[in-house]
Amino acid sequence: MRQLVFALCVFASPALAELEQARDMMEAGQFEAAREELLPAARSGNAEAEELIGVMYGLGLGVEQDYERAFEWYLRSSMKGHPGAQSGVGWYYELGLGMPAPDLVRAYMWYTLSAIGGDPDAAISLEEVVKKMTAEQIEKAHVLVNDYKAWMYPFR
């Protein structure tokens, strides 16, 4: 068992170092280099790297701004339980960015999942989106939340 824990620590450390280095590059305004640093981890399914690439596309940092690409990267990260990305997906649904039209039901769902996951800002987003929704939409959103919550957060 100790060998397994040791092996996990050894192999996880380079990935964590790459993410920290990419964050440092982003803070220094070196977005193209940060993206190159993040892509291997993101393509391997690292939720944090996926979320950061979503941020880059959403804001046009080192890449041409592209809401559809941003949404896709956020969604990948969200499906792995990343609370920040879940709030991002909620925001994209709320405003209809990268899609044909807003979808308040799904915005509510993702904000709720984000709040369950620990994003402190998700509750504020939930309060705002509820103001735009009908009772029927909220009811539909609760059904989706319960479906996703059971799968995404089985122990909460």
Residue spans for each PLM region:
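Sec-dependent signal peptide recognition
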Residues: 1-7
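N-terminal signal peptide c-region/cleavage motif recognized by signal peptidases
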Residues: 12-14
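Hydrophobic face of amphipathic alpha-helices that form TPR/SEL1-like repeat modules
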Residues: 19-25, 41, 52-59, 88-95, ...
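Short helix-capping/linker turns of helical repeat alpha-solenoids
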Residues: 30, 43-46, 59-61, 66, ...
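Terminal, low-structured helical/coil segments at or just beyond the last alpha-helical repeat
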Residues: 121-156
